[in-house]
Regions:
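Short, low-complexity, polybasic intrinsically disordered segments
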Residues: 129, 133-176
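Basic, amphipathic N-terminal segments that precede the first structured/catalytic domain
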Residues: 1-61
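Catalytic cores of nucleic-acid endonucleases
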Residues: 84-143
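Conserved catalytic cores of phosphodiester-cleaving nucleases, focusing on short active-site segments
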Residues: 66-68, 75-86, 114
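Flexible, charged surface loops at secondary-structure boundaries
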Residues: 70-73, 128-130
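Acidic (Asp/Glu-rich) sequence patches and key acidic residues
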Residues: 51-70, 78, 90-91
Length: 176
């Protein structure tokens, strides 16, 4: 299956969750109608797809916020929106540590659960074996105000959630 075919599968089965712009997935932007620019290629509200798929079934796992195709439709993209600006501005005042916030964000868990949901919907357990995949993290950091410091803090926080391919493979192979 190609990235475009996977995207089309979601558009056909969950068309009501197609949004014309990524900010249509963000609650704050949607409520305040901040985004009036329509993208050339819409995204799919993956939280909506997940909620629909698991409705009345069982506990709903975490998921990424949206999916789309990118890179001239060569890549299937998982998109996560994170509001880091407020967190970074008040980091000294907050009682939660960076680690607690990272655990709350659970980026690797969301990506894993989202991939599993794609496999369930398509019925293909080997879906991502050869499918070009991209994880996109969209933030609200202003590039005009201390962009390097903000970016550094964000990368340090993300690095703590990352795993090496080796440890990921070892953990997955133990499950078999």
């Amino acid at each position: 299956m190609t990235p475009q075919q996977l995207y089309d599968t979601f558009r056909e089965q969950y068309g009501e969750y197609v949004v014309p712009a990524i900010c249509g997935v963000d609650k704050a932007c949607r409520l305040n109608k901040r985004c009036s620019v329509v993208q050339s290629y819409p995204v799919i509200d993956f939280d909506g797809v997940k909620d629909c798929y698991y409705r009345g079934c069982c506990p709903t796992p975490a998921s990424v916020d949206a999916v789309c195709v990118g890179g001239k439709r060569k890549y299937f993209c998982f998109v996560e929106l994170k509001g880091w600006k407020s967190y970074l501005e008040h980091i000294d005042k907050q009682k939660r540590s960076v680690n607690e916030t990272i655990n709350k964000y659970n980026l690797s868990g969301k990506l894993f659960a989202s991939k599993k949901l794609c496999e369930k919907i398509t019925g293909l357990t080997d879906l991502f074996d050869n499918l070009p995949l991209v994880f996109i993290l969209v933030t609200d950091i202003d590039i005009n105000v201390s962009p390097m410091a903000s970016f550094t803090n964000m990368l340090q926080s993300l690095a703590q959630t990352s795993t090496s391919k080796h440890s990921e493979c070892v953990n997955e192979s133990k499950k078999c």
